[in-house]
Amino acid sequence: MITFVRGMLAEVGPRSGQSWATVDVGGVGYRVWTHARTVGKLPRIGEEVKLFTLMIVREDAMQLFGFLEPGERELFGQLVSVSGIGPRMGLALLETLAPTELVQAILQGNTRALALAPGVGAKTAQRLALELRSRLSKWREESGLSAMGARASSRVYEEVELALLALGFAPGEVVRALDAVAPAMAGEEQTEAWLRAAIAWLSEQG
């Protein structure tokens, strides 16, 4: 399993509607498939880059899919685990919606937002929202986050917890982040605001 590649950015480009980057690692070029949003944030050709990768192996192909943040890689892995969601559709979803927007759309059952991605129809959007929310809710219970007391029963806390889990943060990190930002977020009822604050705090810790 190749979890990341770091080396010189050799080339980037589109192919068959998909974006990719070739990373030169010790003289070996790794083709890493990604989406336009990631390509737009890459350094210049010849500069060092690190991409967090997920390898998908099929009978006729072995492909690397890469992202600038480990959380986006984890989210991509969650997406392609859903029946009917392949790598191309997973990349289309991440290109259309930023990771936090995508997670919120899934948790809130916003199938209209999910269907904005090319190739994602209404039925696929419904299945995606249903399967991932159910899976993340079970993960949340098993992680112990649901035992946090009265706060855990609130809609905002639940959605933020699930979103952070989907982005690849560990349960312990989620608890610490929410405890840290709670005083400043008192009275705030917008999930997006809580999510931004929690991610900002977690980024500062790294």
Swiss-Prot record:
Keywords, alphabetical: Cytoplasm, DNA damage, DNA recombination, DNA repair, DNA-binding
Cellular localisation: Cytoplasm
Matching SMART domains: HhH1 (SM00278)
GO CC terms in record: cytoplasm; Holliday junction helicase complex; Holliday junction resolvase complex
Keyword DNA-binding found: yes
One Pfam family this sequence matches: RuvA_C
Protein name: Holliday junction branch migration complex subunit RuvA
Organism: Gloeobacter violaceus (strain ATCC 29082 / PCC 7421)
